[in-house]
Design a protein with these regions (language model features):
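Acidic/aromatic-lined carbohydrate-recognition and catalytic surfaces
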Residues: 2-186, 190, 203-261, 271, ...
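Loop/helix patches that line or flank the sugar-binding groove of alpha-linked glycan CAZymes
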Residues: 5-6, 213-218, 222-226, 236-238, ...
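Short catalytic/ligand-binding loop motif for oxyanion handling, primarily in non-cytosolic enzymes
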Residues: 23, 56-60, 103-110, 204-207, ...
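Beta-strand-rich binding/interaction modules
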Residues: 510-530
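C-terminal beta-strand-rich structural cap/linker in extracellular carbohydrate-active enzymes
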Residues: 536-554
């Protein structure tokens, strides 16, 4: 058992723009975060992950960076950031920030130089190609829809942008680019931050030749992930990144590893040779797609997570999560945010949280915050949502249907303001919020839930305390039980003589639990989300909709 401080943390993700506004301009800021640090400490948080607060024109909410060493005015100043770092450390917590190094903003000085002429010294810092006649260099589709190429009239060439056109991709084959990035990374680490969550890092290597995608359907642009996501040769860049930066400091690093399978994860998170301490994998998120009437596949979900648990056992470490700033709210997608909001928020929380790995909570998840239903596309801010909506309208879909699709798929679902109280704008701001507050804020907020012992918030406090209370829930071996059950996700965590059994019915119907190998007693029940009658030596019983239980067996 290889103990590390970062394996024992409880982490919390903050989306600064929506967390807390301190000056009434309707935008969350650094001083607002400082004002809520005691809330996070009381919750049981050890590590804060801060989404981008760098200088940015904000075409993609800060993931388009124009200056890596300065703070966006609406968030505050570098002095504010230094104060935040100090206040976090004063409370015994740690702070990591987003590191966005696949691309910059089109307003970054590097790109301004690069686009100025074909013979500029920084031309090769980005990826430029001539078009094919009047068309783009290839048929790749941007992750944010449309072409992945944008024409620059000044130099009459196209530049590659896997995300928005305002986010040109850096050329990682250029050593000068890599060296400048390493200097910037070490500058932040010398400032005293405790690490990074590294954004879109699996996209930094592009397939040689930038060839067209196969296009049997005759599409204008084709989804191109296989040409730029975890492609052959990326390990060279990852190894150098670690050697030049991370390995010199006692920090924690989390890679956003889209496209990395459990079988390939060794290169990314192996204890000694991996680039990162842990990674965010997205296989479990890919199980959900918007289709009317499509239910949540419990068995597929537990199969994916169990595969990751087993593949990294004794080799690497998992970063556990069910929500972040890029996906809709879990209770509204996988669960039932109407009849069983509280129950399913607790059930999904318990099942992921007590697996082996470092759990991350996204702001508002601990309250059971839900998706939002705006009345018009004009109320949305997310560039991906707006682009997708416009594409759907152009394809002949009605405005009503396109808007309903946005209700369930938009990234803005997780970016609505944090719900602190029942007062105006959920206590987030005394001004006009930059994006609309969810209408259910008077029922779902910190103030209300702190007073309710059965709230989702107080359940998360118990969950955090439980995770920290026994090493078996941190370092213990994970074993799935009831493998073929299509409704119940259940597993054990075992270390020496300590053993826990965690179970949840992840459906809105009753589910029969049957497992003869463990006889369960009510005296050993340590966490639950329904009232449970006294029982002794039970091996079968009924779990109510979204019921979860945790037993300490020994």
């Amino acid at each position: 058992m290889n103990k590390k401080w970062w394996k024992e943390l409880i982490a919390y993700q903050i989306y600064p723009k929506s967390f807390m506004d301190s000056n009434g301009d309707g935008i969350g800021d650094i001083q607002g975060i400082i004002s809520k640090l005691d809330y996070l400490k009381d919750l049981g948080i050890d590590l804060i992950w801060l989404c981008p607060m760098y200088k940015s024109p904000n075409h993609d909410n800060g993931y388009d960076i124009s200056d890596y060493k300065d703070i966006l005015d609406e968030f505050g100043t570098m002095d504010d950031f230094n104060e935040l770092l100090s206040e976090v450390h004063n409370r015994g917590m740690k702070l990591i920030i987003d590191l966005v190094i696949n691309h910059t903003s089109h307003e970054h000085p590097w790109f301004i130089e690069s686009r100025s002429s074909r013979d500029n010294p920084k031309r090769d810092w980005y990826i430029w190609r001539e078009g094919k006649g009047d068309e783009e260099p290839n048929n790749w589709e941007s992750i944010f829809k449309g072409s992945a190429w944008e024409f620059c009239e000044n130099s009459e060439e196209y530049y590659l942008h896997l995300f928005a056109k305002e986010q040109p991709d850096l050329n990682w084959e250029n050593k000068e680019v890599r060296n400048e990035l390493y200097k910037m990374i070490n500058w932040w680490l010398d400032k005293g931050i405790d690490g990074f969550r590294v954004d879109a890092i699996s996209h930094i290597k592009k397939e040689e030749g930038l060839k067209d995608m196969d296009n049997p359907e005759g599409l204008k642009y084709v989804s191109s992930f296989e040409k730029h996501m975890n492609v052959e040769g990326i390990n060279y860049h990852l190894k150098e990144l670690k050697e030049e930066t991370f390995s010199k400091y006692d920090i924690v690093t989390v890679g956003e590893a889209n496209g990395v399978s459990a079988d390939e994860a060794d290169h990314w998170v192996a204890e000694d040779e991996g680039t990162f301490n842990m990674i965010f994998q997205f296989e479990h998120l890919n199980l959900w797609n918007y289709e009317e009437g499509q239910g949540f596949d419990v068995k597929a979900y537990k199969d994916v997570l169990t595969n990751w648990q087993n593949s990294l056992e004794g080799k690497g470490w998992n970063a556990l999560f069910i929500e972040n700033h890029d996906i809709p709210r879990v209770v509204s997608t996988w669960g039932n945010d109407k009849e069983y909001l509280t129950e399913c928020a607790k059930a999904f929380g318990a099942i992921y949280f007590l697996q082996k790995g470092t759990p991350f909570i996204y702001q508002g998840q601990e309250l059971g915050m839900t998706n939002v239903k705006y009345h018009s596309i004009s109320e949305y801010d997310d560039v991906k949502t707006i682009n997708t909506y416009n594409e759907r309208i152009e394809s002949g879909v009605s405005e009503e249907i396109a808007l309903k699709e946005a209700w369930v798929t938009s990234r803005d679902n997780s970016r609505t303001p944090m719900q602190w109280s029942s007062s105006n704008n959920a206590g987030f701001t005394c001004g006009k919020p930059w994006i609309g507050v969810n209408e259910n804020y008077k029922k779902i907020n910190v103030e209300v839930e702190e007073r309710d012992e059965n709230s989702v918030l107080n359940f998360y406090k118990k969950l955090i305390k439980l995770k920290k209370s026994n090493e078996a829930l941190i370092y213990g071996v994970y074993d799935l039980i009831l493998e073929e059950d299509e409704n119940i996700f259940a597993y054990t965590r075992t270390l020496n003589n300590n053993k826990f059994l965690i179970m949840a019915n992840l459906t809105e119907e009753n589910a029969k639990y049957m497992y003869e190998k463990e006889k369960l007693n009510s005296k050993d029940l340590i966490l639950n989300n329904y009232e449970v009658c006294e029982h002794k030596n039970l091996t079968e019983f009924t779990l109510k909709p979204y019921e979860c239980r945790v037993y300490k067996l020994s």
